[in-house]
């Protein structure tokens, strides 16, 4: 009998595939149903963000950051405003720092709910998504009440935040903090010991701690490998130095551990949100420097200088002293960094964006080799790719 030879063949996964999480085109080399190579093709959502920023004032460039990782927009804004503030050398009022920290965690929950539930949906569990999006709706409502927008907030500004929160919003967030752990318990009851969910995630996409560090992984992907690295602890910014929270880590670096880390992080986010509200100081929410922050309506009605400051700020912007900085924050997906270069004018000379999803997507080949075709879906879900920030 003649021996049959199985030839490897190529399969295009996406960009129309619902589990591609956007516009991912993955060229897979398969031997039967086993993956020999996974080659991500990116750029289908490239909009030239970094170049566009060079033609805008520092204030006009801010909304571009909401449109990068549109699943956790305020984290991206935070990195940019911290970079601008560092170059300007201005101090942010304590209340603004606490409000930023609070909404950083609100945004982290928005992202983690989306990620954990859609990953479960991708591998066959529909119920968590239906539970999760009900809770996520409350969080998007908090964002809307604070900034006026559910997604593209543009609420963080150089020098503070755009406006103070409504009086009853903090009470409502505190009530949410009381009810939210029940949702986490329900999802964990559905998934943690679910035989099918564990078969689809345990020992799938394993990465060792050393491999994760070599590839530059950050966030839940790195912490899932057992490395307790979190910029909120190691390089605290705004009010994080005053917060008491733990860094959840995994042990095996597989899809299941990455899921567990994200679930545990949601409980830590609730802890941080409570502390922010309990310790929230009174006072202004933006620096009192009208060359950088706009004056109030009341001031403009009585002061000609205030009116001039307002007009100049929104037409010409402010000049930033010459210099450069790399400023990073712990976004929901990992280390989101902004390398900002100023040449002393009112526009950035260069703005390089370091997006965690871009780095994690490079590791998809490492995670997928030797696994089955169906496991690619679990891997993509567990690294949490968002193409707004990958393609920029």
From Swiss-Prot:
It is found in: Cell inner membrane. It is a peripheral membrane protein. The keyword Cell membrane applies. GO terms for molecular function: NAD binding; NADH:ubiquinone reductase (non-electrogenic) activity; quinone binding. Its main location: membrane. It is an enzyme of class 7 (translocase). Transmembrane segments: none annotated. It catalyses: a quinone + NADH + 5 H(+)(in) = a quinol + NAD(+) + 4 H(+)(out). PROSITE patterns: COMPLEX1_49K. GO terms for cellular component: plasma membrane. Keywords: Cell inner membrane, Cell membrane, Membrane, NAD, Quinone, Translocase, Transport, Ubiquinone. Its EC number is 7.1.1.-. Belongs to the complex I 49 kDa subunit family. NDH-1 is composed of 14 different subunits. Subunits NuoB, C, D, E, F, and G constitute the peripheral sector of the complex. This is NADH-quinone oxidoreductase subunit D. It comes from Rhodospirillum rubrum (strain ATCC 11170 / ATH 1.1.1 / DSM 467 / LMG 4362 / NCIMB 8255 / S1). The lineage of its organism: Bacteria, Pseudomonadati, Pseudomonadota, Alphaproteobacteria, Rhodospirillales. The gene is nuoD.
